[in-house]
Design a protein with these regions (language model features):
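Charged catalytic cores and adjacent phosphate/nucleic-acid-binding surfaces used
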Residues: 4-7, 59, 82, 86-100, ...
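Extended substrate/RNA-proximal surfaces in nucleic-acid metabolism proteins
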Residues: 1-118, 180
Length: 197
């Protein structure tokens, strides 16, 4: 798919730029180290962070982001993502359901969060992540309300990228009343007994 090739190229360019910025900050070999840790997959900031911890440039992943990879820091390069419309279209053409991931983590004001969800729904998004670990009950209620208002299904998620102490996979991910899980839209495989009948 041409779209995925473009996204992959954008990620690769970003990784190259991050490595160049780290090189200028006297941290050589960052791209090679991140690629080694990615094991043939897409290189992310998480791989650079693990490399920098390995090199002793920081004591933890969180420390790496504070010192090097967060917005305004030496190794920060803004991502170049596709539009919401493009991503929804590609997901739907692939037979998937488009889900707005962790909208509560974008540090948006209530006004801009409402605009984001409305825009996503207007372009035929299917669901939004309502339940996340380490989330206040108030935020979960607010996200569920937005999902209901825009007739979106709900999802749950941990935003897990690598093991870390603050993410508890599968814990505290209940959905508030009044929203339905997007997984109810998925085709359920028939068991062997049903197929034989």
């Amino acid at each position: 798919c041409e779209f995925l090739a473009q996204q992959t190229e954008r990620r690769n360019q970003r990784a190259q730029l991050i490595a160049e910025r780290l090189e200028k900050a006297q941290i050589p070999g960052a791209l090679e180290g991140a690629q080694r840790l990615a094991q043939g997959g897409a290189v992310t900031r998480g791989h650079f962070a693990r490399f920098l911890v390995e090199c002793g440039k920081a004591s933890s992943m969180a420390d790496v982001f504070k010192k090097y990879l967060a917005r305004g820091k030496t190794g920060y390069v803004p991502p170049q993502w596709c539009t919401i419309e493009q991503s929804i279209d590609v997901i739907h053409h692939s037979g998937g359901k488009a889900v707005l991931a962790h909208p509560g983590r974008y540090n948006l004001s209530a006004k801009w969060l409402k605009r984001l969800v409305a825009h996503f729904a207007e372009h035929h998004g299917d669901a939004m992540e309502v339940a996340q670990c380490q989330q206040s009950p108030n935020e979960r209620t607010q996200l569920a309300t937005l999902a209901r208002q825009h007739h979106l299904w709900a999802s749950q998620g941990s935003d897990f990228h690598q093991p870390c102490p603050w993410i508890e996979l599968g814990r505290k991910l209940w959905l508030p009343a009044g929203v339905e899980g997007v997984w109810q839209l998925w085709e359920q495989p028939q068991n062997t007994t049903e197929r034989e009948l």
